[in-house]
A protein has these predicted regions:
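Cap/lid segment of the alpha/beta-hydrolase catalytic domain
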Residues: 386-497, 504, 538-540
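Glycine-rich His-Gly loop
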Residues: 310, 357, 423-427, 577
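Beta-propeller folds
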Residues: 14, 23-351, 359-360
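Non-catalytic accessory segments flanking enzyme active sites
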Residues: 193-196, 317-413, 438-441, 445-446
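Bacterial N-terminal signal peptides that target proteins for export
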Residues: 1-8
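Active-site-proximal cap/loop segments of hydrolase catalytic domains
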Residues: 455-637
Length: 637
């Protein structure tokens, strides 16, 4: 079951680039659709701090049907303890101490015409014995979240829970053995959520909404004190990035924050709660936002600043701690051309779970033991191998108004020009981070070159690029997508007579908008789970999100596809899940109703039992979706 490799961490491995010239050799093997449509065979692996056990989430079918397997790390061939939930889907696991595991799961509930997800968490023994303990099993679990394990108190965890059902959670100390609770902080109208404990478990940060100023405010307090101090306020009029990261280990009065503070890109600073002053910028880049800080998670270095991370083409780490850098470098040397993540570690680093992935690798998991032995645990997608997949390039092209637009290009094997697909991301206030992208690789595997424009309005590239998308839906934002296609044509990579646009969520909106432009450059369009009526968006897309309602909703202005149905001028495939809770299926149904009154070339596919996000699409949904997508591109473009 396990393939074993032996190694010594301290031995340097030379990286050879000599074989790259063969990377584009044509592979005539076309994978079955199952290879892409099957849910990941393995999604997580984790060890407790003593490193004695390994817990894995593993699929038992193409539709997932996930179970947890637990083995001793010193005997991975042993028959595992298996944990499963017959009516619930296991989504996530994490060790609370050396013996107890937190298992998160969800279930889809159909209640008349209503269809929704219920999420719960259970505490189970690592040996599989005893009952599953579900905190607050009968109540509405609004705002339930595990905040922290307590390093000095393995019998308790901190969690938030809306025990009074007033949308304001309290912070509760929960005994994982007995289920007894102690409320240690009551939320209030001022500091109502976003609670963060310091390394000792004291709740010293939180946030709240100020109705008078229509702003979200951040609060913190000095260790041992009860009074909250406002440390930052952000309103729609002065929208900037400001994120509380964690408390400093070196100075209990200081916290790490990610913020702009007058700069175009985010950087890392410390903020002194007592004095109200920021440090100089500790780390930042001119053209990219910083992602976060890397902090120690062991009892010996909890909260210690180890380095920073940011994303250009791939996530990148900048180390401050020499020991941490040496550990990463030693492991990375074993996996040339892979992005390496240490996803779980024991206190002494004698048990480290490693995940590797790349543009052309969906991901594999390994367990390193005693700093010298490596055990292969499994792959996310065993049917997909690097030789089946395509190279991904990161470029910047110039939009028609001169703005530089970053983009990822997935280039199929063979010689261009290729039929092309422009694939704008959802959001739109996100960005693509392409380590492995299933949709672009599926399309490239079938001969399409794919470009993923980080159009204006995308985050990660500074305030100016982010805010440039405000009120530009279907306008300059849409120009950026079209200019991505024209860039491929100009470079000789794409056939100008075989251009398509395909997207999901906001990307679905962009596909709707792209199907009705004058002098259209596309031959067809595929719109997945897209918004068609901007006037309805604040009541649906941002319904549960105060951040969305306050900051993003005022920026959603531009072309509303439902008002331009008559202008549709290319074949349009519309796909939507019938229980989509983010963009209700009515957005597509209304558009289809309008299309049926006109002589337009379109097809509507409704995925039964499918929600909005990719992790709620099952094998049956993906099989139908991918079949329709590839058929439309082949026969309509």
């Amino acid at each position: 079951m396990y393939k074993k490799l032996r190694l010594i961490i301290g031995v340097a491995t030379m990286l050879s680039w000599a074989g790259q010239g063969n990377a584009q050799e044509t592979n005539n093997t076309t994978l079955p659709l199952d290879a892409f449509a099957s849910l990941p065979a393995m999604t997580q692996a984790t060890v407790p701090l003593d490193g004695s056990k390994l817990a894995i989430i593993r699929a038992t079918s193409k539709d997932g049907d996930y179970i947890v397997e637990i083995r001793p790390t010193n005997d991975l061939a042993a028959e595992p303890v298996r944990l499963g939930a017959s009516r619930m889907e296991i989504t996530d696991i994490g060790w609370l101490n050396n013996d107890k595991l937190l298992v998160n799961f969800r279930q889809n509930i159909q209640d008349g015409n209503d269809n929704y997800w219920v999420t719960k968490a259970a505490i189970v023994n690592g040996d599989g014995k005893g009952d599953w303990k579900i905190p607050f099993p009968k109540e509405n679990r609004a705002n339930f979240e595990v905040l922290s394990v307590l390093a000095d108190d393995p019998d308790h965890i901190l969690l938030t829970y809306d025990i009074n059902n007033n949308r304001i959670p309290d912070v509760i100390k929960y005994n994982i053995n007995t289920g007894s609770t102690q409320t240690i902080l009551r939320g209030n109208e001022t500091v109502s959520n976003g609670f963060i404990p310091d390394p000792k478990g004291e709740i010293r940060a939180g946030s709240g909404y100020d109705r008078a100023t229509n702003s979200i405010k951040q609060y913190a307090r000095v260790s041992g004190e009860t009074d909250w101090k406002e440390i930052y306020s952000n309103s729609p009029n002065d929208r900037e990035n400001w994120d509380f990261l964690y408390f400093s280990q070196e100075n209990t009065d200081e916290v790490y924050v990610k913020a702009n503070l007058g700069e175009d890109t985010t950087g890392i600073y410390t903020y002194n709660i007592r004095t109200g002053k920021y440090s100089e910028r500790l780390f930042g880049l001119k053209s990219l936002d910083v992602d976060s800080v890397m902090l120690g998670a062991k009892s010996s270095n909890r909260g210690q600043l180890l380095g920073f991370s940011y994303t250009s083409k791939h996530p990148t780490r900048y180390f401050l701690d020499a020991n941490e850098e040496a550990i990463y470098q030693g492991i990375e040397a074993l996996f040339p051309d892979k992005f390496v993540s240490l996803v779980s570690r024991s206190e002494d680093d004698n048990a480290i779970v490693i995940r590797t992935s790349s543009d052309k690798d969906p991901g594999s998991y390994y367990l390193m033991s005693d700093k010298k032995k490596l055990d292969f645990l499994g792959e996310r997608s065993p049917l997909i191998k690097p030789e089946h997949l395509s190279d991904v390039k990161f470029v910047k092209y110039t939009a028609r108004d001169g703005r530089k637009i970053p983009a990822y290009i997935t280039v199929p094997k063979g010689k261009g020009p290729f039929p092309a697909v422009v694939m704008p991301h959802g959001g739109p206030w996100v960005r693509d981070v392409v380590i492995y992208d299933e949709w672009s690789q599926l399309l490239a595997h079938h001969g399409y070159i794919v470009i993923q424009p980080q159009y204006r309005g995308s985050t990660g590239f500074g305030l100016d690029h982010w805010k440039a998308g405000d009120k530009k839906w279907g306008l300059e934002m849409q120009d950026d997508n079209d200019d991505a296609a024209l860039y491929l044509v100009e470079k000789g990579l794409a056939d100008k007579d075989k251009l398509a646009i395909f997207g999901w969520s906001y990307g679905g909106y962009a596909a709707f908008a792209g199907s009705m432009r004058k002098n259209n450059i596309y031959q067809c369009s595929i719109a997945g789970a897209g918004v068609t009526d901007l006037s309805r968006i604040t009541a649906t897309l941002f319904g549960a999100s105060r951040y969305g309602r306050i900051y993003q909703a005022p920026t959603v202005k531009g072309v509303s596809p439902i008002e331009h149905v008559k202008d549709l001028n290319v074949p349009l495939l519309i796909i939507h899940g019938d229980i989509d809770q983010r963009v209700p299926v009515e957005q597509s149904r209304l558009f289809v109703d309008a299309l049926e009154k006109l002589d337009k070339d379109f097809k509507y596919v409704e995925l039964k039992g499918a929600d909005h996000f990719s992790n709620t699409l099952y094998y049956r949904h993906k099989t139908e979706f991918y079949t329709e997508l590839l058929d439309w591109l082949k026969n309509k473009c």
